[in-house]
Amino acid sequence: MAKNTSGRGQRDLKVKVKTARGRKLSSTRWLQRQLNDPYVKRAQAEGYRGRAAFKILELDEKYRFLVPGARVVDLGCAPGGWCQVAVKRVNALGERSDKRVGRVLGIDLQEVEPIAGAEIHQLDFLDDGADDRIKEWLGGKADVVMSDMAASSSGHKQTDHMRIIALCEAAAYLAFDVLEEGGTFVAKVLAGGAEGDLQKLLKQKFTKVANVKPPASRSDSSEKFVVATGFRG
């Protein structure tokens, strides 16, 4: 039998995308990256709504905050990948009869397609009284508040950094109001220098605060995630 020296059969071939008339080169590069991204392929194969699902999966593998019976709030939940992960991890559908049944509440400004096992509400979490409505929907306080939110990109790196830090701080203040003692806060940030104040804020309220870049986060992205555990109340 002839030896395979081309490398084919040893790994998946990369998909090359031609630049179509009217399509920008940047769009072509993005499409090519998507088509060759193993996390995109896994998301499609496993039924997740986006590759971001693997970020929360990897964070939970390390910190174990999505446990059966937990009550979870997902801020800015569209398109729903994080909710899908949470539903499975907290046993929201009661599929594991020997485990406690959790609850998953998704919050977003836009309408989100229904997710089995999750309760989705169209709400601006910055609205007055949003914290009370969330606790009412949950039937009590949350064990986990998580956010993969990002402000609309301005194209200016530092401006985008400041916007997402402000959004993360707003999410943190909501978490202070709705979290059960001992709870966990997880949120996306972009590196850029202003994380210090956010870290100080979270360290006042949580016993441990970590900055993590999970493997599913692209290496060329400045995103990372803050994981704050042990809410002091």
From Swiss-Prot:
UniProt KW Repeat keyword: no
Database matches in Gene3D superfamilies: Vaccinia Virus protein VP39
Keyword entries, A-Z: Cytoplasm, Methyltransferase, rRNA processing, S-adenosyl-L-methionine, Transferase
Reactions that this protein is recorded to catalyse: uridine(2552) in 23S rRNA + S-adenosyl-L-methionine = 2'-O-methyluridine(2552) in 23S rRNA + S-adenosyl-L-homocysteine + H(+)
Major place of residence: cytoplasm
Task performed by this protein: Specifically methylates the uridine in position 2552 of 23S rRNA at the 2'-O position of the ribose in the fully assembled 50S ribosomal subunit.
UniProt name for this protein: Ribosomal RNA large subunit methyltransferase E
Source organism (scientific name): Ruegeria pomeroyi (strain ATCC 700808 / DSM 15171 / DSS-3) (Silicibacter pomeroyi)
Gene name of the record: rlmE
